[in-house]
Structure formats: structure tokens, C-alpha cells
A protein has these predicted regions:
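Sec-dependent bacterial lipoprotein signal peptides
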Residues: 1-16
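A general structural-boundary detector
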Residues: 2, 40, 134-135
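N-terminal targeting sequences that direct proteins away from the cytosol to non-cytosolic compartments
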Residues: 15-72, 80, 84-89, 104-106, ...
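Signature of long, low-cysteine stretches enriched in small and polar/charged residues
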Residues: 95-146
């Protein structure tokens, strides 16, 4: 009987401690210092890309950049501006909003480089959407580039 009382007292006192919350854990991602390789397509389009990625040329010599270690692909589309900047901008703004049914929000970040006269917008598609980032860049006179970044994960 004494053993029963001692066991009950021990259980009550032993379980009275407050639980400690677990600290937040963060990923420690380390990437090598990037080195860049020049690329020129058959169209009026040239760029530099990361040497850890692979450039695969699609139709009309427009590349897609594959990052195998990250399971990511950056799809690019280039267009020459021929008095159709409004149409190109409308299409570029419509593209991220095709994900609105799956996205929680789509904040925009404006990019302006006055020195090189390059302007654009980065769309962060937050939520369970196929593409996490989409963007466009233009000089408003000759060149218009649209990109979509896809991560392949289940």
C-alpha cells in the first residue's frame, strides 16, 4: 500500500514540470561562389549564366536554364519590341496571375536600373503554385525578356 502511495506521489510530482518549446530550426544552405559563362542565341539575345547550370535551347534558340542540384528550371522568353510594348507588358502581367487560384498572394517588386536603362518587375508567387517566381525585364525600346522559375518537388 505504501508503495502505491509513493508511486502516485512520484507520478504527480514527476509530471508537474513545464514543457519547454523547441527552438526554431533553419536550413544552412551553402552554395559555391558563382562563376559565369557567356551565352549567345541565334536571335538578338545574349547573357551570362551560372556554370553550375545547364543551358538547353528550346524553339527559336530561346534557352531554358536547368539547375540540376536544385531541381529548378528557369524558362526564358525573349521578344523584340516593335511598337508593341503595351501588349508585351499586358502579357507579362497576366502570366503570374494565372496562378491566382493556388497562390495566397503575389507581391510585386519593381526593378529600375537607370544607368543601363533597364526596368522590370519580379512577381513572388506565394503559396502552392507551380511557379514561385516570375519576372520581366525591358529597356522599353528594343528588348523584352520574360522569365519563370519552377522548382520540381513533391
Amino acid at each position: 500500500m505504501r508503495l502505491g502511495y509513493a508511486l502516485v506521489v512520484f507520478l504527480i510530482l514527476g509530471c508537474a514540470s513545464e514543457s519547454q518549446p523547441k527552438p526554431n530550426g533553419y536550413l544552412r544552405l551553402e552554395y559555391p561562389i558563382p562563376t559565369y559563362v557567356p551565352f549567345t542565341s541565334l536571335t538578338n539575345f545574349s547573357m551570362e549564366y551560372n556554370s553550375l547550370s545547364e543551358v538547353k535551347v528550346r524553339n527559336q534558340a530561346i534557352p531554358k536554364i536547368v539547375y540540376p542540384e536544385m531541381k529548378a528550371t528557369l524558362y526564358l522568353n525573349y521578344a523584340t519590341v516593335n511598337n508593341n510594348l503595351d501588349s508585351l507588358l499586358n502579357d507579362a502581367y497576366k502570366l503570374p496571375y494565372k496562378h491566382i487560384s493556388k497562390a495566397e498572394s503575389i507581391p510585386e517588386k519593381i526593378f529600375i536600373n537607370e544607368r543601363n536603362k533597364v526596368y522590370g518587375t519580379l512577381f513572388s508567387v506565394i503559396g502552392n503554385a507551380a511557379s514561385q517566381y516570375q519576372f520581366f525585364l525591358t529597356d522599353s525600346i528594343d528588348h523584352f525578356l520574360v522569365g519563370s522559375l519552377y522548382f520540381y518537388a513533391q
